[in-house]
């Protein structure tokens, strides 16, 4: 027998009351986005489950993709069949025969939501267990901690049989907690921050600052590929490229070296906030980790934050660098993040940046700039690209091959 579908069990959605179906429908849409590379599959949801019909597609890559989607508590490859006792008996016998080995223990666990079905749960357990003994007389039944728990569900539309339960990513479906703008440089920390924001249901749009010719096409492709990795957790992400060359040159030419980083970050924050307002976001997300670099001391954060009243979410703010690296490796962004392309945060970096910048000094130095004009020109020059889940090739590897 081949699996018919993957049955997805919802996570925290069961606690969402009147909004439950909104959360479930969002999860369904996210699953459809993530599984877009598999055109044969079909997705439908009800209040208790989401069903991914395989329609002949190999189940293993579908399972691997679904395991990453936020809002999925658990999933099981299942056999779907008509609600017929003879069909159930044959299916259970075939499945257990294929799984059997010496010393194997099992139990049948039936759940019947269709109360019009001819047998109740206890009767089905007894009947199907007896059917297994008919073909496997040496097998042992065990009610506590068996090797195999064969789950049989009798629902209104069909019967379902499964024996695997695979842990999902948990969290909330992406898009159920509003929209935020993720400041993504291309380093290790910001993709991890984006991942953690996605886990709590935030619909992120990625804001990436590019300063050609100081930053290369490779740096831009790297940021887009990091964004593509994040699409695996909840579907498509809008990637917003911000032209930043003019501003960085202005800062380099007119500001004291010690304040280059502070002023650069203040401009980035202003621009991100303007894009957030334009695109109806609610928060800004970044990868700042307290004390990790000069721009991430409390004094620096205070001086940079002063340009906006928008809430700033910093998911990795209390994490050690090693913890962030381990999470980046776990979510498969680390190898991309360490590719040697310079970004806006590394070009023009001063040798001795100010670790305790004064807000008054930053504001005084900014009097040398046409702040509104610079911000307006940057925002009007943004390029928005929809990033969809990757299908086959790692685009960064392809880019490197092309450059060599």
Swiss-Prot record:
Its main location: cytoplasm. SMART domains: THUMP. One of its GO terms (cellular component) is cytosol. The keyword tRNA processing does not apply. ATP binds at residues 183-184, 208-209, 265, 287, 296. Residues 60-165 form the THUMP domain. Pathway: Cofactor biosynthesis; thiamine diphosphate biosynthesis. Gene3D superfamilies: 3.30.2130.30, HUPs. GO terms for molecular function: ATP binding; CCA tRNA nucleotidyltransferase activity; tRNA binding; tRNA-uracil-4 sulfurtransferase activity. GO terms for biological process: thiamine biosynthetic process; thiamine diphosphate biosynthetic process; thiazole biosynthetic process; tRNA 4-thiouridine biosynthesis. It catalyses: [ThiI sulfur-carrier protein]-S-sulfanyl-L-cysteine + a uridine in tRNA + 2 reduced [2Fe-2S]-[ferredoxin] + ATP + H(+) = [ThiI sulfur-carrier protein]-L-cysteine + a 4-thiouridine in tRNA + 2 oxidized [2Fe-2S]-[ferredoxin] + AMP + diphosphate; [ThiS sulfur-carrier protein]-C-terminal Gly-Gly-AMP + S-sulfanyl-L-cysteinyl-[cysteine desulfurase] + AH2 = [ThiS sulfur-carrier protein]-C-terminal-Gly-aminoethanethioate + L-cysteinyl-[cysteine desulfurase] + A + AMP + 2 H(+). InterPro entries: Rossmann-like_a/b/a_fold, ThiI_AANH, ThiI_fer, ThiI_N, THUMP_dom, THUMP_ThiI, tRNA_STrfase, tRNA_sulfurtransferase_ThiI. It comes from the Bacteria. Pfam families: ThiI, ThiI_fer, THUMP. It is found in: Cytoplasm. It is an enzyme of class 2 (transferase). Its EC number is 2.8.1.4. Keywords: ATP-binding, Cytoplasm, Nucleotide-binding, RNA-binding, Thiamine biosynthesis, Transferase, tRNA-binding. Belongs to the ThiI family. NCBIfam families: tRNA uracil 4-sulfurtransferase ThiI (TIGR00342). Catalyzes the ATP-dependent transfer of a sulfur to tRNA to produce 4-thiouridine in position 8 of tRNAs, which functions as a near-UV photosensor. Also catalyzes the transfer of sulfur to the sulfur carrier protein ThiS, forming ThiS-thiocarboxylate. This is a step in the synthesis of thiazole, in the thiamine biosynthesis pathway. The sulfur is donated as persulfide by IscS. This is Probable tRNA sulfurtransferase. The lineage of its organism: Bacteria, Bacillati, Bacillota, Bacilli, Lactobacillales.
